[in-house]
Amino acid sequence: MKKTRQEKERMVEELTEKLSQAESAVLVDYRGLDVAQMNELRRQLGDSNVDFKVVKNTLTSIAAENAGIDEINQYLEGPVGIAFGYDDPVVPAKILNDFSKENEELEFKAAILGESVVGEEKVKNLAKLPSREELLGKVAGTFQAPIAGFAGACQGIIRKFVYAVDAVRQEKEDAS
């Protein structure tokens, strides 16, 4: 069924908004994936707050121009799916990379990070980076280790002090 001009304009507006708000947008060629694989991909992305859209390339091109990301047009050939990540720029690339290991038909095309466009190789490198949560966990662990060590040392000192006071008390009781 053919879409009306109003529907297309609404889709362009929605896509422009997504491109503007997303931390990252990863473009993939999904040719060769069957319906079950596409549904599984959408489910995995959705579980991590990542939207996945398949929109006509001409509408995507117009939305990219509206969002000030004209460089993406060179990657809009063939069937293109776009994964929009809002919380962490690494998450869409990681999920798509993991999915492509099991489904070789899925191929990276490019990614939009902020207002810059990067090619396939940089997207694959992005997928290898730790996520924001992993980095925060490492930072917290780095801060926690010295604090835990300090707390352990303080407990040791207090324990020794208590033993010393108890020994003095014991001596006084024995002397009386």
Curated annotation (Swiss-Prot):
CDD domains hit by this protein: Ribosomal_L10
Gene3D superfamilies in the record: 3.30.70.1730, 6.10.250.290
Pfam hit, one: Ribosomal_L10
GO BP annotations, alphabetical order: translation
GO MF terms, alphabetically ordered: large ribosomal subunit rRNA binding; structural constituent of ribosome
Keywords: Ribonucleoprotein, Ribosomal protein, RNA-binding, rRNA-binding
Keyword Chaperone: no
GO CC terms, sorted: large ribosomal subunit
Keyword match Repressor: no
Family: Belongs to the universal ribosomal protein uL10 family.
Subunit structure: Part of the ribosomal stalk of the 50S ribosomal subunit. The N-terminus interacts with L11 and the large rRNA to form the base of the stalk. The C-terminus forms an elongated spine to which L12 dimers bind in a sequential fashion forming a multimeric L10(L12)X complex.
HAMAP family, per database record: Ribosomal_uL10
PANTHER family with a match to the protein in the record: 39S RIBOSOMAL PROTEIN L10, MITOCHONDRIAL
Physiological role: Forms part of the ribosomal stalk, playing a central role in the interaction of the ribosome with GTP-bound translation factors.
Protein name, as recorded: Large ribosomal subunit protein uL10
